[in-house]
Amino acid sequence: MYPIKRNRRLRSNESIRSLVRETILSPNDFLVPLFVVEGKGIKDEIPSMPNYFRFSLDTLEAEVKLLWSLGLKSVLVFVKVADALKDNKGTEALNSNGLMQRAVKTIKNVCPEMLVMTDVALDPY
């Protein structure tokens, strides 16, 4: 005989349901990739990635402010290192005035609380 009462202890009230639910995504869960290039006034869409752009440092400022205002608090920075600066050891990654270092400084100047992650991206070397 099938039971008349179904004991759903994990669904008995909202507090328990919210505790055991599988997934909830919020802006805090997202990491936004930022692609940075040398130059001024650059915001070029990446053809293979619709709605993603390459930013110069000056246009990066506005993007970081926008992301923060939307509640997005983490970014992952990728830079396009000029071919002339590439070598077998990836020494540009250690340049204190390199594009990556300047990009991180720009982001932190605009939004000190932004979580910034970087990718040295040695694969193009």
Model feature map: region roles:
Residues P27-F30, L70-S74, C111-M114:
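Short, well-ordered coil/turn segments that N-cap beta-strands
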Residues K86-V120:
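Alpha-helix-loop-beta-strand connector modules within alpha/beta enzyme cores
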Residues K43-F55, L72-G98, Y125:
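Glycine-rich, proline-tolerant flexible connector loops at the mouths of alpha/beta enzymes
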Residues K65-W68:
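Non-catalytic positions within long, well-ordered alpha-helices that form the structural scaffold/packing
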Residues M1-R21:
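N-terminal amphipathic/basic leader segments beginning at the initiator methionine
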Residues L25-Y52, M117-Y125:
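N-terminal small/glycine-rich loop or linker at the start of catalytic domains
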